[in-house]
Regions:
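Flanking helices and flexible, charged tails adjoining ferredoxin-like Fe-S electron-transfer domains
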Residues: 1-5, 167-239
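Iron-sulfur-associated redox domains of electron-transfer enzymes in respiratory
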Residues: 1-123, 128
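Surface-exposed beta-strand edges and their flanking turn/coil or helix-capping segments
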Residues: 22, 52-53, 97, 155, ...
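Helix N-cap / beta->alpha transition motif
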Residues: 39-42, 136, 210
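Short gly/pro-enriched beta-turn/loop segments at secondary-structure junctions
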Residues: 2-5, 128-130, 143-144, 149-150
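Ferredoxin-like iron-sulfur electron-transfer modules
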Residues: 121-142, 153-179, 188-197
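Small-side-chain structural scaffolding
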Residues: 23, 29, 43-46, 133, ...
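Local cysteine-cluster metal-coordination motifs and their immediate loop/turn environment
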Residues: 12-17, 47, 60, 65-69, ...
């Protein structure tokens, strides 16, 4: 059941997991029904940057990706968990029913066109958007395997708790730490398949990732970056 009149939709602008036409149609129908609607380009980015809008958004209904992912993201940002509907997995009639609207609601064509234009205007940053892990603490056993595996300083240990400390350090499109998690507690909301993306399927039927190769590749990249920084320092002219 919908908790409030204000509804926030996430467009996931730099990825294609959420159909933009569905976003435009849903926004138009909600607006026609008298709801206050806001489309956010990338909720993950707002959360990574800990936007001061998060508390406001959390007080209302959020229509975005998988609820388990949204819950973990808002908990990481130390914000209340909003009522969430899954736009990534559900079709338009299912979402409308969950929002207490007729499943066959008329779609206002002019407003759909306006929202479509808004969506097309969002900045797209393929390869540079907010890719980072979040942790489902209801599953995490604080074993620290993710911390030990990651070469980029994404995780830290605070007491006996694993914390995502530097999300911006994460290597784009690398979910290797999630593959190594014994309880499937690590979520990458922008990953393609469940359970790594927070979807509820029991087992993932994806092409397996060779974590040893990923680790070695990441290590080489890190060593190369370190050598480059040392070279720059050596060649810097003296004052």
């Amino acid at each position: 059941m919908m908790q409030s009149q204000k509804i926030t939709l996430c467009a996931c602008a730099s990825r294609t997991f959420i159909n933009s036409e569905k976003v435009a149609q849903l926004a138009a129908i909600l607006e026609a029904a008298g709801k206050a609607v806001e489309i956010v380009p990338d909720l993950c980015e707002w959360i990574e940057n800990k936007s001061d809008r998060l508390k406001e958004i959390a007080a209302h209904t959020v229509v975005a990706c998988h609820p388990r992912a949204i819950k973990a993201l808002f908990e990481w940002a130390e914000q209340p968990v909003p009522h969430t509907l899954d736009m990534r997995a559900n079709d338009l009639p299912t979402l409308l029913t969950a929002l207490d609207l007729p499943a066959d609601s008329a779609i206002p064509a002019e407003r759909v066109a306006a929202f479509r234009t808004q969506l097309e205007g969002f900045s797209k940053q393929p390869g540079q958007d907010a890719w980072f892990p979040t942790i489902d603490k209801s599953r995490c056993i604080e074993c620290g395997k993710c911390h030990d595996f990651c070469l980029f300083g994404v995780y830290t240990l605070e007491g006996k708790k694993v914390v995502v400390k530097a999300p911006q350090n994460c290597k784009n499109n690398c979910p290797a730490c999630a593959r190594n998690c014994p309880t499937q507690a690590i979520i990458f909301p922008k990953y393609a398949q469940a359970p790594i993306n927070g979807g509820e399927q029991a087992e993932e039927k994806a092409i397996s990732i060779d974590t040893a190769t990923l680790y070695n590749t990441a290590l080489r990249e890190r060593l190369a970056a370190r050598r480059a920084s040392v070279s720059i320092l050596k060649n810097r002219p003296k004052a």
